[in-house]
């Protein structure tokens, strides 16, 4: 099994070391937070991070919004000490699971990029008219086919599912 530590509140109260205190005290192996928190903490004195033992960390992660390259590097360099894979994930509540993310120790990491679709996910980038974009062209993200965590019915009441979500 695994122990989960759930953190409540803001990362800067009562001190800007709050995250790092929790990691040190509980010997956290995987730490997952939002880029907004990272950007906020990166503005503070580096001692807030440096004064704590974070060597228990094996993987650090980012979730909730795109992470910019500057925040990615600060998180990787000062929290992960350039030794922990930084898993930048993309998903939405509606998708039911992470859809695009690197595989720690396998995928080459790219600052500010969630990298590759996970197994069973077929993303497409399309224009407004739903034609597939050319490489390097901006567009909207679509998922081509149903994915493993997609809700496709309500157990024992498919009509309710259709009426609630599609009609």
Residue ranges and their predicted role:
Residues 9-13, 26-31, 61-65, 112-113, ...:
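Hydrophobic alpha-helical scaffolding
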Residues 12, 38-39, 151, 162:
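Nucleotide phosphate-binding site architecture
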Residues 2-3, 20, 28-33, 42-109, ...:
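Gly/Ser/Thr-rich phosphate-binding loop
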Residues 4-22:
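ATP-dependent adenylate-forming carboxylate-activation enzymes
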Residues 106-113, 164:
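Short, P/G- and charge-enriched loop/turn segments at secondary-structure junctions
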Residues 116-120, 131-166:
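Conserved ATP/PPi-binding loop(s) of AMP-dependent carboxylate-activating enzymes
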């Amino acid at each position: 099994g695994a122990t989960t530590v759930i953190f409540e509140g803001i990362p800067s109260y009562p001190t800007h070391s709050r995250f790092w205190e929790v990691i040190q005290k509980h010997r956290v192996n995987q730490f997952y937070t939002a880029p907004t928190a990272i950007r906020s903490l990166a503005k503070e004195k580096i001692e807030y991070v440096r004064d704590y033992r974070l060597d228990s960390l094996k993987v650090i992660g980012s979730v909730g919004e795109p992470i910019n390259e500057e925040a990615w590097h600060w998180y990787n360099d000062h929290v992960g000490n350039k030794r922990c894979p930084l898993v930048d994930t993309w998903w939405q509540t509606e998708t039911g699971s992470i859809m695009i993310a690197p595989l720690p120790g396998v995928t080459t990491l790219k600052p500010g990029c969630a990298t590759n679709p996970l197994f069973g996910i077929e993303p497409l980038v399309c224009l407004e008219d739903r034609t597939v974009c050319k490489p390097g062209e901006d567009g909207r993200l679509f998922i081509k086919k149903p994915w493993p965590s997609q809700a496709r019915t309500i157990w024992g009441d498919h009509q309710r599912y259709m009426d609630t979500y599609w009609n």
